Amino acid sequence: MLMPKRVKHRKVQRGRMKGKATRGNFIAYGDYGIQATECGWITSNQIESARIAINRYIRRGGKLWIKIFPDKPVTQKPAETRMGSGKGTPEYWVAVVKPGRVLFELTGVDEETAREAMRLAAHKLPVKTKFVKKSDFEEVGGEINEG
């Protein structure tokens, strides 16, 4: 399960998800990827489940990069507890994902295999996604534009 080794603050506020992703919104390492089209929280268990689904389908064929990391703790209070008496204990970790963020990248396999592997992974995730290729992000004068 993915989680930070150590954190500055054990509990954080929930925050709100506004706007589009400004970082990690293009394919940097692989040839194919899966890109979020809506915002949401992806837990470390969901990331791991998607990773296993991709690796089982591609077998030993390609290389996979996980481009998101769960660095936000989510707290929960025990069941049947009265209101008050402080914030609950951290139960699990989530990655905050905005629209446009590339979640996984894949290389070393053909497009059909990559498309099916990413489809299987998308079923494990709580956000809507789309399949993207490296050629979708063309570089124009040092700036990467979505084509």
Swiss-Prot record:
GO terms for biological process: translation. Transmembrane segments: none annotated. InterPro entries: Ribosomal_uL16 (IPR047873), Ribosomal_uL16_bact-type (IPR000114), Ribosomal_uL16_CS (IPR020798), Ribosomal_uL16_dom (IPR016180), Ribosomal_uL16_sf (IPR036920). It comes from the Bacteria. GO terms for molecular function: rRNA binding; structural constituent of ribosome; tRNA binding. GO terms for cellular component: cytosolic large ribosomal subunit. Keywords: Ribonucleoprotein, Ribosomal protein, RNA-binding, rRNA-binding, tRNA-binding. Binds 23S rRNA and is also seen to make contacts with the A and possibly P site tRNAs. Belongs to the universal ribosomal protein uL16 family. Part of the 50S ribosomal subunit. This is Large ribosomal subunit protein uL16.
